[in-house]
Amino acid sequence: MLWLALGPFCAMENQVLVIRIKIPNSGAVDWTVHSGPQLLFRDVLDVIGQVLPEATTTAFEYEDEDGDRITVRSDEEMKAMLSYYYSTVMEQQVNGQLIEPLQIFPRACKPPGERNIHGLKVNTRAGPSQHTSPVVSDSLPSNSLKKSSAELRKILANGQMNEQDIRYRDTLGHGNGGTVYKAHHVPSGKILAVKVILLDITLELQKQIMSELEILYKCDSSYIIGFYGAFFVENRISICTEFMDGGSLDVYRKIPEHVLGRIAVAVVKGLTYLWSLKILHRDVKPSNMLVNTGGQVKLCDFGVSTQLVNSIAKTYVGTNAYMAPERISGEQYGIHSDVWSLGISFMELALGRFPYPQIQKNQGSLMPLQLLQCIVDEDSPVLPLGEFSEPFVHFITQCMRKQPKERPAPEELMGHPFIVQFNDGNSTVVSMWVCRALEERRSQQGPP
């Protein structure tokens, strides 16, 4: 048992902090830090890298008062962990209890053979760590671009792949600080979607990108876009994912209900999978729903996703037009806000237009909040019953309840008659619709 003599929270600056790094099946290593409140997330990862040199650690966890594991993968979440720990220490001191070290649990990426499910390899061209002992420098920069680049290298170092293996073809779109290309991976012959991102971007965008990588490594679902890996060259990071030849749903016109129902099943299953990991998508919209000619439907672009801490969050990110009323109002939100976005997205796909006529979406930019006030003030739009089935109308109506707690929970979504009706595994319906739509698009474009 280890004792810490900690004074009031305001005096923590001068106190010694002991962090106990738990090693799976091998005990633990204690690390003494003399300036705990100034400790950075990057510093902890560097020391974990020395304790576990064979693993690539991208995050770590600690336990809250209920014994639940909370993930730390940024300086902001690091501060939240330290604040929680110091408040616990103060309470223990008041009660005359023994003070335990701060226990953390490294979370390493899966081994390359297990993680890289699509058979590609990755090379970030990263050099070895410059730290040789578990000592933290008090002068390390907290928000430098160099540090962010090193963090990217740390996460992505898991194989052998370079830019010379990639042949870029068409531009698929823009977003989240980068451009997405259709590309050919020469050694494997695979077609990829490659998001290329310049690093001279805002720190907030860097944080979003890091979040996306973390979630892509974690996810293993047939309803989430497949992650091949990434490579780092000069001032660019390239993220390689599965290519969906049908593209995103925002480019399609009005979708028939029998097709939309089967698409909805896949999207709900994808969201339910994320929610089971305590992850909010936060940017559910048609352009982040991809289809292919095989009839598969997958969620993509987790650039604004993050671990759901204590089942609630309070930040401003995402695409305003699809935000739930509580998000537009700046209130707390959780899973039920994703449910609203699900509802308004499928209402748009069913109608072939955005459900609020007074809102003209400006593609690629966030809208002024005053233009979205109608979503907060007005009653939710309703699908016309004469044009759509009663189960579908009810599904959308429930998802778009103004009060978050009145919207369906994940298990209620999967059990809704509309979802149950189309949960038949019939991907042929979606496949035929995608192929037909692509053929119509090609015929309208004419010969090249």
From Swiss-Prot:
GO term, biological process aspect, one: negative regulation of response to cytokine stimulus
Enzyme class, broadest EC rank: transferase
Subunit structure, interactors included: Interacts with PARD6A, MAP3K3 and MAPK7. Forms a complex with SQSTM1 and PRKCZ or PRKCI.
Phosphothreonine: residues bearing it: T315
Compartments where found: Cytoplasm
Source organism superkingdom: Eukaryota
Reaction(s) the record says it catalyses: L-seryl-[protein] + ATP = O-phospho-L-seryl-[protein] + ADP + H(+); L-threonyl-[protein] + ATP = O-phospho-L-threonyl-[protein] + ADP + H(+); L-tyrosyl-[protein] + ATP = O-phospho-L-tyrosyl-[protein] + ADP + H(+)
Modification comment: Activated by phosphorylation on Ser/Thr by MAP kinase kinase kinases.
Residues making up the signal peptide according to the UniProt record: none
Record key words, sorted: ATP-binding, Cytoplasm, Kinase, Magnesium, Metal-binding, Nucleotide-binding, Phosphoprotein, Serine/threonine-protein kinase, Transferase, Tyrosine-protein kinase
Biased composition (Polar residues): 126-144
Record PTM Phosphoserine, positions in chain: S311
Region (Disordered): 116-144
EC number: 2.7.12.2
Cofactor or coenzyme needed: Mg(2+)
Chain's gene name: Map2k5
Name the UniProt record assigns to this protein: Dual specificity mitogen-activated protein kinase kinase 5
Organismal lineage: Eukaryota, Metazoa, Chordata, Craniata, Vertebrata
Residues that bind ATP: L172, G173, H174, G175, N176, G177, G178, T179, V180, K195
GO terms under cellular component: cytoplasm; spindle
